[in-house]
Design a protein with these regions (language model features):
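Two-component/phosphorelay signaling modules centered on CheY-like receiver
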Residues: 13-31
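Short, flexible helix-to-coil linker/hinge segments that flank and couple to helix-turn-helix
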Residues: 90-95, 99-133
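Active-site residues of response regulator receiver
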Residues: 54, 82
């Protein structure tokens, strides 16, 4: 079976490295970009199955980048990685087409679940983001 292809977007190189280690070898990580504008360009060119992106990035934030990609017909599933626990961010990410909303503090336990859910068109939200433990 072919591995799902993932593109990462985060402006913190050490976090990109950790995310890559978590996702491989189960998934093929195509690479990483550090801002939303670069994400839009790379996603159009590479056509990944899943985008794992930070909410807060320079030039174009993750939410705006996701909206732009969806408006352009991008079919990649979107999983947001974030430090934001504010429900307004969660709602904005879901409205932008996100299927995953993962707390960076729970990345090790939640990210693979979120990607799997996204690939099967299901929503995954880190339990801490919904007030659960």
């Amino acid at each position: 079976m072919k591995k799902a292809r993932i593109l990462l977007a985060d402006d913190h190189p050490h976090l990109v490295e950790k995310v890559t280690q978590l996702l491989q070898p189960e998934y093929e990580v195509l690479g990483a970009v550090s801002d939303g504008q670069a994400l839009v360009s790379a996603a159009e060119r590479l056509k990944p199955d899943v985008l794992v992106l930070d909410v807060t990035m320079p030039i174009l934030d993750g939410i705006e980048a996701a909206k732009k990609l969806k408006a352009q017909g991008c079919e990649s599933k979107i999983v947001f990685l974030t430090v934001h626990s504010d429900p307004d961010y969660l709602r904005a990410c879901l409205a932008a087409g996100g299927l995953g909303y993962v707390s960076k503090s729970r990345m090790a336990s939640d990210l693979l679940h979120a990607v799997h859910h996204a690939l099967t068109e299901r929503i995954f939200i880190s339990p801490t983001m919904t007030g659960q433990k």
